[in-house]
Amino acid sequence: MGKIIGIDLGTTNSCVAIMDGTTARVLENAEGDRTTPSIIAYTQDGETLVGQPAKRQAVTNPQNTLFAIKRLIGRRFQDEEVQRDVSIMPYKIVAADNGDAWLDVKGTKTAPPQISAEVLKKMKKTAEDYLGEPVTEAVITVPAYFNDAQRQATKDAGRIAGLEVKRIINEPTAAALAYGLDKEVGNRTIAVYDLGGGTFDISIIEIDEVDGEKTFEVLATNGDTHLGGEDFDTRLINYLVDEFKKDQGIDLRNDPLAMQRLKEAAEKAKIELSSAQQTDVNLPYITADATGPKHMNIKVTRAKLESLVEDLVNRSIEPLKVALQDAGLSVSDINDVILVGGQTRMPMVQKKVAEFFGKEPRKDVNPDEAVAIGAAVQGGVLTGDVKDVLLLDVTPLSLGIETMGGVMTALINKNTTIPTKHSQVFSTAEDNQSAVTIHVLQGERKRASDNKSLGQFNLDGINPAPRGMPQIEVTFDIDADGILHVSAKDKNSGKEQKITIKASSGLNEEEIQKMVREAEANAESDRKFEELVQTRNQGDHLLHSTRKQVEEAGDKLPADDKTAIESALTALETSLKGEDKADIEAKMQALAQASQKLMEIAQQQHAQQQAGSADAQASNAKDDDVVDAEFEEVKDKK
């Protein structure tokens, strides 16, 4: 069985790890970094860039450089959170035919899982380069508070990337695995506070050790899937834009290029203010008007940044209270607090968390790598490489169906350990009713319409009977990935209907297969592009070296040969501007044929140089034929 890799598919950065024996190892990507920016760019010449290369060109290509895609995965276009992003993102968010939030990439509607798959492909390639063998299986992490649609969309992204997703696990749970596996912690209750680039989670986890086996049991989880570092950046960007408008009278929001530069500068300033008390945002030539170019130079203090984001930090505190309450614990029952996610490096966040729990968070967990390490550990558990570890996760939100009067009736309550199965018997609302619609919901509200609709299906063929008489058994079954399977059975007729909830906003099987095929086709075109570039480089090198040799040969090269070589050089130069690898190779071959006489002259010149060098060394040796004398230094006596 091959390796199951662990992937932290983050909003801002992603990370991949593997089990190396009994130790998890975070892998460096092609650029030599342990984390990869979750940024995808589509260039004018049809190339797809992922990670640092995509980030570097964002300023000149803002509309086709996509970031924070995780905030859109599994979401409807009309969702309030999506509408907030529509107005501030430099790229175009559009409504798909099924009402999903998709993206407009160079005029083509593209699904978020398809774009996230590009990041997963890079993670897969990083692991394959390290292992020297193909990788086909992965454990991928998601925020604990992701709903069913978001989990399913993440699995779809994995499939499009050519990965069989063996397990979806919650990010805080993965961080707890990374923290607890190699420590002799005994029985402990830990709080994992995970504030990443786009999402926030809190999980209360109990680590029990019995006879050498460690059980990681999630007692409760809560969070906000639209709160993270990107929101902190946006606050700072808005402040800088407003200050510039006050000073110069120009609103930079209408200038995508300026906004992209500002986004980079704001992110950098935010990071600097975690260690410094103040920083300068200095952007020369940020824009121009009739009077000439304009420059931005604004001083930002840590206190100013904290005042801009204080309500965001406070927003993360309420879920902490709810999670503790759901777990039936008080603050004093928590032994350790673990911080995960890059945004937790902000001193204000650390201070607020310390104040709430009454203890300093632990500093021995890498907030950027812990989640990927935990995913790799779970991969090791699935392959049998990691033994004596049992992971008991929970479903983050209640699951149920709509019943008479538009009420949601929960079949599985939030924070129930998964996998789990629960059945309940319902009946008809009308006399002689022959069919019922099962409307599946996820959420905590009593009114059905206030919860997230996960989909619906019909159970037909119910025998005519007075209302309330038929017995319809509805069963909810949640697998270890937190994905829901629902069935409804008429106990009288034995008729049954089943569905795996794909959510009304999910991709159907046909769409996923099409995207998988496109990804495979792209992999082939990427390979061909790489081969073309290598051939071009060889051609460039041949051009340069041949021209140099023609120059060095001078009059020794016959005129006919020189003309033939010049003609072959021109032909190769023209071919290098094209896209035909075979033609470039043919022109290189033709140049080599035409250059045979030149090669002979070059070899003769080289031989003469070697002979001349040998003569010079012999002559120097004669000059050096002198006698060394020993001498003794005698110091004068004073």
UniProtKB/Swiss-Prot annotation:
GO MF terms, alphabetically ordered: ATP binding; ATP-dependent protein folding chaperone; unfolded protein binding
Induction: By stress conditions e.g. heat shock.
UniProt-listed Pfam families: HSP70
Ranges of biased composition (kind: Low complexity): 602-620
Region (Disordered): 599-638
UniProt key word Hydrolase: no
Keywords for the protein's UniProt record, in alphabetical order: ATP-binding, Chaperone, Nucleotide-binding, Phosphoprotein, Stress response
CDD domains to which the protein is assigned, alphabetical: ASKHA_NBD_HSP70_DnaK-like
Phosphothreonine: residues carrying this PTM: 199
Physiological role: Acts as a chaperone.
Family: Belongs to the heat shock protein 70 family.
Cross-referenced PANTHER family: HEAT SHOCK PROTEIN 70KDA
Protein name (record): Chaperone protein DnaK
Gene name linked to the record: dnaK
